[in-house]
């Protein structure tokens, strides 16, 4: 990704092409794939998940907010030549996300406590270290720069975005 950005900036310098880089966290919304889709399916199946002790914070952005931001980048003259970190502006813990997905589907979440170090150890043994890190580690993006420069505010709050994603499943 970094190499691609470098190439874009070089092309911009040589040709005068206006470039704006948007760095994304996890994107969620209708038709989501990957780990979030697997998590939704586990909630649907009512499988108990050993994740209640996780105290991470992860930035995310809903597809509706991302589309709104990209339109703003195209239209706003101050976007050219900038790099923006973007998110919905509310960082979520894994248990909060699972609880909200469950509630949006009309279920109660089935989380139970399990030592995080042991969870990480077991996932590492079976070759799923990246997956467990995404569930347990924090990744927070500060979207203050994009809010100030473009006067952008995400039009859809996180809870509504998650509800829309789940309803679209």
Q: What kind of region is each of these model predictions?
A:
Residues 1-5, 26-29, 56-61, 91, ...:
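Short-chain dehydrogenase/reductase
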Residues 1-20:
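Active-site Tyr-X1-5-Lys
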Residues 3, 32-38, 52-74, 81-82:
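Substrate-positioning beta->alpha
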Residues 17-38:
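Flexible, glycine-rich beta-alpha linker
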Residues 34, 58-64, 92, 141, ...:
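Residue-level signal for the nucleotide or nucleotide-sugar donor/cofactor binding architecture
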Residues 40-51, 107, 112, 142-144:
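A short C-terminal helix-loop "cap" of Rossmann-like NAD(P)-dependent dehydrogenase/epimerase domains
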Residues 63, 99, 122-153:
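Conserved C-terminal active-site "lid" loop/helix of NAD(P)H-dependent oxidoreductases
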Residues 72, 76-130, 159, 163-166:
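Mid/C-terminal beta-alpha module of Rossmann-like enzyme folds, strongest
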């Amino acid at each position: 990704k970094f190499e691609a950005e470098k190439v874009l900036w070089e092309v911009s310098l040589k040709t005068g092409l206006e470039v704006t880089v948007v760095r994304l966290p996890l994107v969620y919304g209708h038709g989501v794939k990957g780990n979030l889709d697997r998590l939704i399916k586990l909630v649907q199946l009512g499988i108990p998940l050993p994740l209640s002790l996780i105290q991470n914070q992860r930035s995310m952005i809903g597809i509706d907010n991302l589309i709104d931001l990209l339109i703003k980048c195209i239209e706003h003259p101050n976007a050219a030549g900038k790099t923006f970190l973007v998110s919905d502006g509310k960082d979520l813990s894994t248990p909060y996300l699972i609880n909200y997905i469950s509630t949006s589907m009309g279920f109660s979440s089935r989380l139970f406590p399990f030592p995080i170090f042991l969870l990480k150890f077991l996932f590492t043994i079976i070759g799923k270290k990246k997956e467990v890190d995404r569930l347990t580690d924090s990744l927070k993006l500060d979207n203050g720069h994009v809010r100030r420069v473009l006067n952008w505010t995400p039009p859809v709050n996180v809870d509504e975005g998650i509800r829309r994603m789940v309803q679209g499943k």
